[in-house]
């Protein structure tokens, strides 16, 4: 990641998170949450395009990059991850509503906050890329096509073997894998092995728990879903028929693959900006008029 940012350390419980901030302090805040096995560095192309209009905030999620890596599986639950987002937002946005963008596991974990009434009025807009809400997934009937694409989830639950794969060359060859499968030239991340090994706890701490007992989770903020149609890990069908949970929302298919944030940063940045800009003024007005009695109501009207 180019040093066009200020680096902060934010404490979330007993975990220190590395946070990278750029753009004017007066600009609308926009938080970017990365997926697996990335760090906040994956957002560099998007940051460069959005920092002229937004106060761009990205952070290494727990276990990745320069952030602390708890050892217990229980420290990687969706509840803890949503707590990290709150800590980052409190430290960087104050009481101002913020726009939120998540990719891959960053998107999955952001859904926990977006569907939490406690965040109502704080999140001005949410753009989800290649990462569904696990509660929505497991309350629907998973199609065979998606089941076949999700082989890696079962693999990451195996003992020993996944770690060996990453240690014995997987981490070193990761940029090559992205070049072959995604046609992107990713810079080598010096903490790739750390990202990969710790990030497997995200799968182990959350998938079985949500599969056993999916919850009813309704969006508390305007939602936009960007859907890469050639995603080899998440099928486009996983983001359809969500009106019950999201109300009105934006869903747009993008001609791209899973790491579309690296392959097509111009397109993704423009879609983020378009949606966030449309929601900025209503979010500020709603935040000013927000009353505690309204918390928990389902959001039914989204531009």
Locations of the language-model features?
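Glycine-rich phosphate-binding loop signature in dinucleotide/nucleotide-binding domains
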Residues: 24-25, 91-96, 275, 279
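Catalytic histidine-centered segment of alpha/beta-hydrolase-like enzymes
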Residues: 256-269
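Hydrophobic "lid"/C-terminal helical patch
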Residues: 85, 89, 268, 272, ...
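Conserved HGGG/HGGXW glycine-rich cap/lid loop of the alpha/beta-hydrolase fold
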Residues: 20-68
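Flexible "cap/lid" subdomain of the alpha/beta-hydrolase fold that forms the substrate-access gate
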Residues: 2-4, 15-17, 38, 42, ...
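Short, hydrophobic alpha-helical segments
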Residues: 101, 207, 272-283
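Hydrophobic residues on the short alpha-helix immediately C-terminal to a glycine-rich phosphate/catalytic loop
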Residues: 46, 113, 238, 271-275
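Alpha/beta-hydrolase-fold serine-hydrolase catalytic core, especially in secreted/extracellular enzymes
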Residues: 279-303
